[in-house]
Amino acid sequence: MTRVSIIGLGLIGGSIGLALKQAKSSSLRVTGFARNPNAARRACERGAVDIAAPDLPSAVAGADVAFICTPPSAMPDILRNIASHLPPKCVVTDTASTKVQVMTWAKQWLPATTQFIGGHPMAGKETTGIEVAEAGLFRGCTYCLVPGEGTSEASLRLVSELAEAMGARPLVLEAQAHDELVAGVSHLPTLVSTALFATAEGKDAWPLMSQLAASGFRDVTRL
């Protein structure tokens, strides 16, 4: 039985749990951790995890694979806190949208014996939280994988197979290439969307302008 740990039980972490449990329920045991106890409780109730761990050390105890599904800013603290509690053969991966900095943190904080594979599923919603998590979120999407130094073929194959079980298509990239490509197709559109809405909302005529906004404006500013 594969033992999976999911740290962070929002949209992405919850959807990973739901997708894996749906695809491999009989051969998988999922432990989850969320700083918000209500999110952890709902993840259990929704079937995204089998058990909610009370803390980070408990979350990774005995894990074969640990997914870190938090904002990048939270990762240094998480990596420091789990480093001494990881099983020797545990593979650690993440879901952050940038990889160069994350790979640097992993090398800095994780034991040399730990295999870290950067991950980034190209999927999401404009809403967040465990309540909007869904098993089909990753179906048909590209799942970027960035092997770390010394990543074994077996570890990369394990994470690739889990991504495929979620319905995604694994794509192996180098960290720098990932960040440059994603900046153009994900980060830039988000920036443009935010800038457009902020500019329009700041106009004195926004109350009237908003009544004229139709599907085109909604589509562009959805992000």
Question: What is each model feature region?
Answer:
Residues 1-65:
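NAD(P)+-binding Rossmann beta1-loop-alpha1 motif at the extreme N-terminus of oxidoreductases
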Residues 3, 27-29, 115, 142, ...:
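Residues at the starts of beta-strands that form the adenosine-phosphate
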Residues 35, 70, 95:
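Short beta->alpha hinge that forms the Motif I/post-I loop of the SAM-binding pocket
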Residues 56-91:
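Rossmann-like NAD(P)-binding element
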